[in-house]
Amino acid sequence: MSGLDLSDDSMCFCCGSRNPDGLGLEFEFDGREVSTTVSFPKKFQGYRDIVHGGLLSTVLDEVMVTLLIKMGQLAATAELSVRFLKPLRVGDPIEVRAWLLESRGRVFRVAAAATLKDGTEVARAESTCVAVAPAPT
């Protein structure tokens, strides 16, 4: 990925603090897992009052890549697999968390889950990510 500008201009759709159309996600890192909480407004629905699966996939991907950044690696998703378990209703807050499954050189396998407040898991994901540079400190 040489030649790409990987600097953060705070316009990321998921976490960019300067993106007025973004989700404004903030993350917590406990040394092993990254987590965030989000609820989607109606403008992000697919079917009536159901969050579009693409948006949920985006947040699952974001939390997995953010885990690697917090662990010191800028990474890009090479493969993403999402399993939708239950419909997510517009406005329902979810916790999305990610953890490392495996690390081999520059390749990382990461998992994530999206869970309602009552503990119901609405989606889970796995990704293969490739480190592209050390994360800025």
Where are these regions (language model features)?
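Residue-level recognition of well-ordered beta-strand positions that form the cores
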Residues: 37-39, 81-83, 97-99, 113, ...
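A conserved, well-ordered hydrophobic junction motif at loop->secondary-structure transitions
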Residues: 37-59
